[in-house]
Each structure stands twice: as structure tokens, then as C-alpha cells.
Amino acid sequence: MSNQNGKTKLITDNRQARFLYEILETYEAGIELTGTEVKSIRAGRINLKDGYALIRNGEAWLINVHISPYEASGQYFNHDPRRTRKLLLHRKEINKLIGQVEQKGLTLVPLKMYFKDSWVKVSIGLAQGKKLHDKRETLKRRQDERDMQRAMKRW
């Protein structure tokens, strides 16, 4: 996510995905949204925690991401909060992802959502699930780093 092509503004970050999965590669994807979804995203009412992506019929889909209904519009014009949304990727990227997801048993996880200029983008990670001992190791390493920082602060 470089700032060379335009301004970027982070909307939400899926920190739990980085704890539960080992991220091997990341991809930037556009996302197909309705007007009320964009307004809710601008208000910051989105949750990526339970989301994942699938490749179906040669297209990428973002599933189970919760975008709260826009409060200013009525119920009739609003969207379904957990609807399946289409991801916009290049054909080469989709073909590469199909091979890696099917052969290696990897997962596609949304890592963050941000505005790039006026477009909503999703950073998708090709991920491999961590084992319990890997998660414990991560927690231990994090705690050790905190302890070292506290010790350095005292000096």
C-alpha cells in the first residue's frame, strides 16, 4: 500500500487475522459496493473479523464481512449487512490464487480496508492457519518485547 498513486486513508484493520494466520502474500482488490454501504464505511461501521474470501466460477467473493446498515436511509433502500460482495482482481491474480488455494490448502483473509483516492480497497492476504504453539510463541515474544521496552525505559 504505497502513497505514490494517491492518498490512502485506513478504514479498518483486521488485527486478529495476523494473530490467527501466517500471512504469505497480500493483494490489493477493489470491491463492488452499493451507495449505502459506502456511506456506512465512511462512518467506520464495518467489521472484517469474521470475513474470508472465496474464488467461485473464476470470480473472487468477499463473504461474511459485516457492514452495518446506513442509519440515515430507510429500511427499504438499505443493504443486507452480511451480503456476499464481489472483489475486483486481475485475471492473472485470480488464476494464481486459485492454484494456491486449491493445491496448498491456503485461505484468503481480508486484512484491512482503506480508501485509495475515492475508491474503497481491500487488502487480502493469502494465509496459512497457525497452530496453537505458534500462537503461544507469538504471545510470549510480544510479552518479552514489552518487558524489554519497560526495562529500557527505566534506564
From Swiss-Prot:
Subcellular location: Cytoplasm
Main location: cytoplasm
SUPFAM superfamilies membership: Small protein B (SmpB) (SSF74982)
Membrane recorded as keyword: no
CDD domains: SmpB (cd09294)
UniProt keyword list: Cytoplasm, RNA-binding
Record GO terms (molecular function): RNA binding
GO cellular component term, pick one: cytosol
Keyword Flavoprotein included in the entry's annotation: no
Stretches assigned to coiled coil: none
Pfam family, one: SmpB
Example of a GO biological process term: trans-translation
Function: Required for rescue of stalled ribosomes mediated by trans-translation. Binds to transfer-messenger RNA (tmRNA), required for stable association of tmRNA with ribosomes. tmRNA and SmpB together mimic tRNA shape, replacing the anticodon stem-loop with SmpB. tmRNA is encoded by the ssrA gene; the 2 termini fold to resemble tRNA(Ala) and it encodes a 'tag peptide', a short internal open reading frame. During trans-translation Ala-aminoacylated tmRNA acts like a tRNA, entering the A-site of stalled ribosomes, displacing the stalled mRNA.
Database matches in HAMAP family: SmpB
Protein family per UniProt: Belongs to the SmpB family.
Protein name: SsrA-binding protein
